[in-house]
């Protein structure tokens, strides 16, 4: 008698952390929707905006996705060129500078 049977538990499960074939493919989530409506509203308020129409929220998410994709792509290029596998803050600073958006306060 196994320990699971003696405790009254179910039997027949995998032991040792091994996992069988997956039945369903894992779908990729839209993480950009994590940028919530209140977060976009707060950013707009900081920029001096008083009222925001509904389509602006989705458009803001699309613009943010494009901007971050470009910055991350350039940052990874700097990291790979240096022969590293970890993106540093300076890689991001150089990527932003390359795009004409100089960020101050991160000199090494």
Swiss-Prot record:
Name the principal localization, coarsely classed.
nucleus
Stretch list, region Disordered: 1-36
Keyword line: Chromosome, DNA-binding, Nucleosome core, Nucleus
Name the SMART domains for this protein: H4 (SM00417)
> A Gene Ontology biological process annotation?
nucleosome assembly
GO CC entries: extracellular matrix; nucleosome; nucleus
Q: Which SUPFAM superfamilies match?
A: Histone-fold (SSF47113)
Concerning InterPro entries, the annotation shows: CENP-T/H4_C, Histone-fold, Histone_H4, Histone_H4_CS
Ranges of compositional bias, category Gly residues? 9-19
Q: Where in the cell is it found?
A: Nucleus; Chromosome
Which Gene3D superfamilies does the UniProt entry name for this protein?
Histone, subunit A
Domain of life here?
Eukaryota
What family does this belong to?
Belongs to the histone H4 family.
Record PANTHER family? HISTONE H4
Protein name as annotated: Histone H4
Underlying gene: H4a
């Amino acid at each position: 008698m196994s320990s699971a049977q003696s405790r009254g538990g179910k039997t027949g499960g995998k032991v040792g952390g091994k996992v069988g074939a997956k039945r369903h493919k894992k779908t990729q989530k839209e993480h950009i929707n994590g940028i919530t409506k209140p977060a976009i509203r707060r950013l707009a308020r900081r920029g001096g905006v008083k009222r925001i129409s509904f389509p602006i929220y989705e458009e803001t998410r699309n613009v943010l996705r494009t901007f971050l994709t470009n910055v991350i792509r350039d940052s990874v290029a700097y990291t790979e060129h240096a022969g590293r596998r970890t993106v540093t803050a300076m890689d991001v600073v150089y990527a932003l500078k390359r795009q004409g958006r100089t960020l101050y306060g991160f000199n090494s």
